[in-house]
Amino acid sequence: MNVSVSAAELVTGTYHLEIESKCGEGNVTCESILMTGQNKHSGEPVTLTGETWHTVCADGSPCRFLGYRFFDGELTYFIHQSGLLEVIAGDRDLKLSEQGEWRD
């Protein structure tokens, strides 16, 4: 299997993040996504492993790509394809919602 490493950079008001996929080229889903970066205000580093995030088709297979999700204890980081970063505690407690910008 060919393993392709691809990376993207997302900058929001609070975070500077790099998203790196370590999955094979052509995979629809990936459970080996690395997010590294830093909180720009506190300087605190962030390193989490996550997965791609998709809608689910009627047959149960992944459909449209939505972005990425990362889990850190009770927190879930959602990074939308549009660059929106949301951090949610538990099921519904929105801790952060910021529009970011993807950079090359």
Language-model features, listed with the residues they occupy:
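Cysteine-centric segments in proteins
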Residues: V3-D104
